[in-house]
Amino acid sequence: MCCTKSLLLAALMSVLLLHLCGESEAASNFDCCLGYTDRILHPKFIVGFTRQLANEGCDINAIIFHTKKKLSVCANPKQTWVKYIVRLLSKKVKNM
């Protein structure tokens, strides 16, 4: 009888723990860039971008480029090549 109660209590605690972990994970589905790439990306590999702003929950401003291979690459928005690609992609969207 004692073992059954302990087993039931352990099972209930496990279910509760899994439920709580699932909720906290869903609430934080946004990843922040912590640094920038050292490489210059070619525009032909980039399909889109997202702006990350430091005042919206992340530590640094960044441009997150989305590649054809479904990778996310963090880039410094102050660099010339980053500004060029953002301008290029923005023009493509306007012309659609």
UniProtKB/Swiss-Prot annotation:
Q: Which residues form the signal peptide?
A: 1-26
Coarse class of the protein's main subcellular location = secreted
Its cellular-component GO annotations read: extracellular region; extracellular space
User: What induces or represses this gene?
Assistant: By bacterial lipopolysaccharides (LPS), TNF and IFNG/IFN-gamma. Induced by phorbol myristate acetate (PMA) in U-937 cell line and bowes melanoma. Repressed by IL10/interleukin-10.
Q: Which UniProt keywords apply?
A: Antibiotic, Antimicrobial, Chemotaxis, Cytokine, Disulfide bond, Inflammatory response, Secreted, Signal
Describe tissue expression: Expressed in the seminal plasma, endometrial fluid and follicular fluid (at protein level). Expressed predominantly in the liver, lymph nodes, appendix, peripheral blood lymphocytes, and fetal lung. Low levels seen in thymus, prostate, testis, small intestine and colon.
Source organism, top-level taxon: Eukaryota
Q: Which family does it belong to?
A: Belongs to the intercrine beta (chemokine CC) family.
Q: What is this protein called?
A: C-C motif chemokine 20
